[in-house]
């Protein structure tokens, strides 16, 4: 990569940010396309978010990704926010459009595209079960609840009250009925029976606790039940292995990571990035 005085600057802000895969993915895409950009990581403390975004304007940085814990905090400093980002309540991409800062949420695109391309879903099933009720669940529920084919969503969470609050909020936005249950074996067995897709948005199974799994009713898994696990470290979670054991289709969190990043890249550059190159560079980091 040759960085010149004319190079457009892209980046990611977070606290911490050293663990981010985004510089690897985006710089690989930049190299593959041969365009005059570079992508760097900025460690921004929570109390400096507003200053960082003023710097984005002042330095004419083309765009930023936003990671934990700033996805909500940046919103008050933006000039415009997309409909999806407002619905999800979080911004993970900022575009500097001639001095106007516009916030987007590309996780929604990442969820849908990962399921279509990586899981091979030609049509979304009418019944979907989502495990968890945190920030990742919100993006997933909005993405799937916005699909015409999906008629019923069920949220399972260890804290039922949190799931109820999310369901009430997202029912108003999506217009879809959302039922709620406790994340336990009995409820999984009951809800998995009629579902065509299960999405894990919990951190269970994430490195370093790779032996954990949110699957408590293994007997309820069948070969027609698609799993989408948003965890991407490790690349193959224990839950994914449990579904594979019965011949069920699975999709891991790496695909969402790549596709949400690809959508950000499109917003900033107007170009379609090579997602195979972006995915390969992340896989190599795990090797």
Per-region residue spans from a language model:
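Short, conserved loop/helix-junction motifs that constitute active-site signature segments
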Residues: 3-6, 123-124, 147-149, 215-224
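Rossmann-like adenosine-cofactor binding region
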Residues: 175-250
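Short glycine-rich anion-binding loops that position phosphate/pyrophosphate groups of nucleotides
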Residues: 66-73, 135-136, 203-206, 233
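Adenosine-phosphate binding glycine-rich loop
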Residues: 224-226, 230-287
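Phosphate/diphosphate ligand-binding glycine-rich loop within oxidoreductases
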Residues: 3-120
């Amino acid at each position: 990569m040759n960085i010149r005085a004319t190079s457009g600057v892209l980046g990611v802000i977070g606290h911490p940010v050293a663990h981010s895969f985004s510089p690897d993915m985006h710089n690989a895409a930049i190299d593959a396309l041969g365009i005059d950009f570079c992508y760097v990581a900025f460690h921004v403390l929570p109390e400096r978010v507003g200053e960082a975004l003023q710097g984005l304007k002042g330095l004419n940085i083309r765009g930023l990704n936003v990671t934990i814990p700033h996805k909500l905090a940046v919103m008050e400093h933006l000039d415009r926010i997309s409909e999806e980002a407002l619905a999800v309540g979080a911004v993970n991409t900022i575009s500097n459009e001639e001095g106007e800062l516009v916030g987007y949420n590309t996780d929604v695109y990442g969820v849908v595209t990962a399921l279509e391309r990586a899981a091979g879903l030609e049509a979304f099933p009418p019944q979907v079960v989502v495990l968890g009720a945190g920030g990742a669940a919100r993006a997933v529920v909005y993405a799937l609840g916005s699909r015409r084919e999906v008629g019923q969503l069920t949220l399972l969470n260890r804290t039922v009250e949190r799931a109820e609050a999310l369901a009430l909020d997202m029912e108003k936005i999506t217009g879809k009925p959302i039922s709620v249950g406790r994340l336990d074996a009995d409820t999984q067995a009951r809800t998995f029976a009629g579902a065509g897709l299960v999405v894990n948005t919990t951190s269970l199974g994430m490195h370093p606790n790779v032996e954990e799994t949110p699957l408590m009713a293994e007997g309820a898994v069948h070969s027609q039940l698609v799993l989408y696990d948003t965890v991407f470290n490790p690349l193959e979670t224990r839950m994914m292995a449990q579904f594979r054991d019965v011949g069920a289709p699975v999709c891991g969190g790496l695909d969402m990571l790549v596709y949400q990043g690809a959508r950000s890249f499109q917003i900033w550059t107007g170009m379609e990035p090579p997602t195979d190159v972006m995915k390969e560079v992340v896989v190599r980091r795990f090797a």
